[in-house]
Amino acid sequence: MKLDSFTARRGNPELVAPARATPRETKPLSDLDDHWDLRYLQPSLEFFRVVDGDRRPARPGDGIKAALAEALVYYYPIAGRLRELPTGHMLAVECTAEGVVFVEAEADVALEDFGEPLMPTFHGAEGFLCDVGDTRVIVGRPLFYLQITYLKCGGFVLGTYMCHCIADAFGTIQFLKAIVDIARGEAKPTTLPVWERELFLATSLQPHIKEDQKKLFDELESTTCDDIMVTMPTENMVSEYFILSQIDMAALRRHVPLNLNKTVTSFELLTAVTWRSRTIALGYRPCHIVRLMIVVNARGRWKKLPLGYYGNGLLCSVIETTVNDLCTNPLGHTIELVRKAKDEMKTEENMQLRVDLLPLWREKPYIKVQRIFEACDIKWIGQDTLDIGWAKRIGGGIPTVSPPNLTSYQFLCKNEKGEKSTVISMLLPQPAMDRFKKEMAAWLIE
């Protein structure tokens, strides 16, 4: 059964406030949080199978709702509202304790109807998510939405929207883990939250801009564009997931030269192959400049970031080359390009430079850079730690809902054989998607 073949019967939405009194204050966002490209509600889905036990509530939603209220005591800014400051069109959080949205729903389907083990694609996932309207409207409205959908098998789905200005994917999982920790019976979250958004504020009013970065800024001000990935509305594209088994990964590694085979990571290899395949599929001319944007998690790399930081902590590095250079050289050359982009974020000095550039990006119009491929590794995001005790997580991830995301995510799941596999998301026009599939299939031929 496909996810688009059922109807969820939703109850009335209600606001859930923190379980106890919380500070009333205004909290500014970081320069990274306040980036215009993050001003939207990010969806996610988590599927659970209920297990027997003494702590199992008669109705899972009661336990989740109570845990949500308790978690908001610690994560109280999430219960507030975004306001636009008088100057600079910048946002801040008013900690008003107005609450987040909670909805209960029912659907006459079972976990088994979606295939076992559960894997993407999550087409039609809107049934598991609150009706939030325009996901780009974030000021003056709730910052978090949670819908629990009961399935006829006794399992349930947690569908959430988190305002991306408040938390990135890692921070969102941290908040969800706080909820499930308390629902499991813990007195408080196992990881306590840290706000400290000043850690991602620019420290230089006149940062040094490298030549390649200047070209990006100049392009944002350009009024001409011939890249279909920019000119075509994302709603007219198709989004698909590609699942690569361990056998598939072994087939890809056979294309890697010996001097790189033992050191290349799965992210580097998959990013190199998908970047080349996508570039060919889009039909860019050999002389065109193409770019790769690597999204790097600063957690664990930047010593000043404390455990529990749940704000946006993903920084980007960009490299460029020509289509001819990318697609006619051996795969090892592409892997080296990917590594070059990753290495840009190796030093704390370079990470601070990226932060110092953020205010300049805010002044630019909301235009996507031409012929750029954005890759993000969320394989170790921590979804497998969502242990409620009386319910076991069996799958989940980022669903395909409007507006689609241009970023290509890599994450983990189990395939039909129960083997750990890597999933890649891809958004393309339909003709390009057809060509992309053929290019990927060619790489997987042993």
UniProtKB/Swiss-Prot annotation:
GO terms for molecular function: acyltransferase activity, transferring groups other than amino-acyl groups; hydroxycinnamoyltransferase activity. The active site is at residues 164, 387. InterPro entries: CAT-like_dom_sf, Plant_acyltransferase. Gene3D superfamilies: Chloramphenicol acetyltransferase-like domain (3.30.559.10). This is Spermidine hydroxycinnamoyltransferase 2. The keyword Transferase applies. The lineage of its organism: Eukaryota, Viridiplantae, Streptophyta, Embryophyta, Tracheophyta. Keywords: Acyltransferase, Transferase. It comes from Oryza sativa subsp. japonica. Hydroxycinnamoyl transferase that catalyzes the transfer of an acyl from p-coumaryol-CoA to spermidine, to produce coumaroyl spermidine. Can use feruloyl-CoA as acyl donor. Contributes to the natural variation of spermidine-based phenolamides in rice cultivars.
